[in-house]
């Protein structure tokens, strides 16, 4: 049940991109949020989207939406190349920002975004939904049962039979590519498990239409720990990770998006194989409720921006390694 309307965090969405529909549903289901406005590049498109999704206000201009003083928080699902411009613009107008992943086109832009939000006293978070699922907290608790953590392996792929020319993932000028779209999740899973940055990385990628079509990477950490990851648009759907320790390993085969909203699973493989399950959970609703709670409390959580910037730093290093053909130190 929604809280009193006067206490709800008022959201605006900057773009009618496909993912905006999913997040709009999450805002509508969240107990502490309401979707007030949508903006698109044309008033006609914004109005049509608003009517379809029962949004009260439609703007045919992104800048006008950001000038709406009634809005508390902005969700930005624009192409990655546009994230920095509009996040900084939102922050300068006192809006809290939930920005779709990857956080930016590169780590320099990501740092600028984080700095702008901090200087203007607003929250910044990237749109990585899986970290907000109840299963993720349960898995985190179980990592201690694995012994000393030694390895993390993560993969996220899907297959394009024909490259869609109108998809932002395939447009280098919009900062497309498999690493930002898919590998970003893998890097986040590795940082989530090891809770620190790698010391060096190596990667190799294959390019099509000017973007990394697939990429495989190795990440080295202190104490002889290693992580590997791969992502790409050329393999059937895979969205799994494994965390291996000296006593047991944890495996999740659908970590980015659980197969069902009714339950989510993972396994512990050791002397006995254990299957663990959670109850019903919609991770994007949890994300919106968490973000809105931060806005309501006025107690900002800078660690969300920090981990997003660090994810971008690792992604940049992986791309640099591929381009140089050698190990890159962080």
In which residue ranges do the predicted regions lie?
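Active-site loop of classical SDR/Rossmann-like NAD(P)-dependent oxidoreductases
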Residues: 276-289
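C-terminal helix-rich "cap/oligomerization" subdomain common to oxidoreductases
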Residues: 1-6, 73-75, 222, 293-330
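N-terminal Rossmann-like dinucleotide-binding module
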Residues: 1-53, 292
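Beta-loop-alpha module in the N-terminal Rossmann-like domain of NAD(P)-dependent dehydrogenases
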Residues: 23, 53-116
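Contiguous beta-strand/loop segments that form the cofactor/metal-binding neighborhood of enzyme cores
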Residues: 1, 188-258, 287-299
């Amino acid at each position: 049940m929604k809280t009193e309307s006067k206490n709800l965090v008022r959201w605006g969405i900057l773009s009618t991109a496909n993912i905006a529909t999913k997040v709009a549903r999450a805002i509508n289901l969240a107990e502490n949020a309401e979707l007030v406005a949508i903006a698109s590049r044309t008033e006609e498109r914004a109005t049509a989207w608003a009517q379809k999704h029962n949004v009260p206000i439609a703007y045919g201009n992104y800048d006008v939406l950001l000038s709406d003083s009634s809005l508390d928080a902005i969700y930005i699902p624009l192409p990655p190349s546009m994230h920095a411009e509009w996040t900084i613009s939102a922050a300068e107008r006192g809006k809290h920002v939930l920005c779709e992943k990857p956080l930016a086109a590169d780590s320099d832009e990501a740092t600028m975004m984080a700095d702008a939000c901090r200087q203007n006293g607003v929250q910044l978070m990237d749109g990585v939904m899986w970290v907000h699922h109840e299963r993720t907290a349960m898995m985190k608790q179980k990592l201690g049962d694995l012994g000393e953590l030694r390895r993390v392996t993560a993969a996220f792929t899907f297959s394009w039979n024909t490259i869609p020319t109108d998809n932002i993932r395939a447009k280098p000028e919009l900062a497309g590519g498999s690493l930002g779209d898919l590998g970003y999740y893998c890097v986040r899973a590795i940082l989530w498990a090891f809770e620190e940055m790698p010391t060096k990385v190596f990667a190799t990628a294959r390019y099509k239409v000017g973007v990394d079509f697939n990429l495989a990477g190795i990440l080295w950490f202190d104490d002889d720990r290693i992580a590997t990851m791969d992502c790409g648009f050329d393999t059937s759907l895979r969205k799994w990770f494994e965390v291996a320790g000296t006593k047991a390993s944890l495996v999740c085969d659908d970590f980015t998006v659980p197969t069902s909203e009714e339950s989510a699973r993972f396994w512990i493989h050791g002397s006995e194989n254990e299957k663990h399950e959670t109850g019903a959970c919609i991770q994007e609703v949890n994300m919106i409720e968490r973000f809105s709670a931060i806005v309501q409390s006025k107690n900002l959580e800078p660690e969300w921006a920090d981990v997003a910037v660090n994810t971008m730093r690792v992604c940049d290093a992986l791309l640099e390694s591929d381009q140089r053909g050698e190990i890159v130190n962080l």
